[in-house]
């Protein structure tokens, strides 16, 4: 059986306590057995446009109006998918882990997939297609792509020829927009203590782990 994961991230790679810098970095993946939810997202967009609701090129939780967010969450909370999230409090990362953006990104992905791959891939015969939201500008994107490829190679439970990865903008795939919404809800909970939207999807969360929850050590 072919399984699908769509993943996004929240937070930044600024390891400082300056204003407007995230406290956490979160990698969030949703697992689907089919991509029907993507068709439902497109149908919702068309319906909203028909009703005269201004919608940009795609759904994006940070920029969408509260009215549109409500419509999207009303849709996705009734769909069948699983959510997996690795949460890293950046100030607790030792120096070698935050030596570069690339290293830190790879670290987050490694522990997410290490701890969730047995749940994502149920049988050795399964196939996996991983679609990851591209990060920032095109320059340097290959480093992040290589990081995820390497992590998958280390953690996958199926033959190397049975999985594929692709990196693209959220605009290119409505299932990535679902991942964006889930990641946004998680970030609101962790950064602001606001679980309003998180509560709408929490029944779908199969893994949500604060990497260094047991540590009181901060390194900046």
Report each predicted region and the residues it spans:
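Phosphate-ester processing/binding pockets and catalytic centers
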Residues: 1-220
